[in-house]
Structures are given as structure tokens and as C-alpha cells.
Amino acid sequence: ERKGALQLNGLLDMQKPHITYSIFKELARPTLFIANSDLEAKKVYNELRFYTKDKVEYLGTDEIYFYHLDAKDRSEEAKKLRVLLKLAKKQKTIVVTSVDAILRKYIPKKVLLDNIFTYKIGDIINLEELSQNLVRLGYERVSRIEGLGQFSIRGGIIDVYSLEYTNP
């Protein structure tokens, strides 16, 4: 398997999702589809979901919703983080994006991967250090978790609602 980019031009719009999925099936790494616009990217994404719902992701540009300015809804941020993690970990997935979205600044791959920490049963955890690390990464310490990006430490029990997962 050769590494590098594959660029296809001259395809009809209706051929793009089918050809992309055909290429994706043959590769053991992520496939990145860059569309001319967010509108085209969303259309290709929706069509690719016909072929594979669980292996296709959409990475769009940041949209500003003025009625959400004060809300602490981090679901869009979480979706982007999950997509970036899949790319960084080289998971087999199709990421559909636009030129505008791909030109945005994202967290460097090394920084992203260096800030992932995993614990298993039996590990001894320094709660103060864990708390500081989570706050440094943008998590909010709360008494009761209600949303993404929050964590709670009560009586030696740690609850984290990671942006990487859909459930706490």
C-alpha cells in the first residue's frame, strides 16, 4: 500500500461518494474527502452514510449561533475532537470536510496525543494532579456532571464526561 494523497478530478457529483467509499474499503487508514464548500461536504457526508454510518465523520467550519453564546453546550467541540482523534490515531474512517474547514487552525497531532491519559482498574491516582490536568485541558469541575467537558471528584470516586465519548 502506497502512502500519499490521491486526487480525483472530473467526477460527477453523484459519483464522488461511491468512488470515495470504494477507495476507503481498500485502505487501512483514514480517508479524507475535501469538498469545495461546507454545503457540498455535508451532501457528500450524508450520501456516504448510506454506505457506512459508523465509519464516516463530518468536520465542518465553526458556525456561530447567536442564541447559544451564553450556553455551555460543547457538543460541536466534542464532535470535532472525536474526528481529530480518529485522524490522529489513524483509525479507519472517512472524514468529509471543506476547504474552509481544513484551512482552520487545529490542535497539533502531537499535542493532542500527548494529552490523552488512560487509567485502568487498580491504578493509584493522585486526585489533585488529575484535577489539575483536567482543568488545564479545559474541563470544568462540578459537584454533579450535567454535560460534556465536566468532571466530579466525590469521596474518592471520579466521574469524567470526556469530550471523546458520547456518554460519561
Labelled PLM ranges:
Residues 1-168:
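ASCE RecA-like P-loop NTPase motor cores
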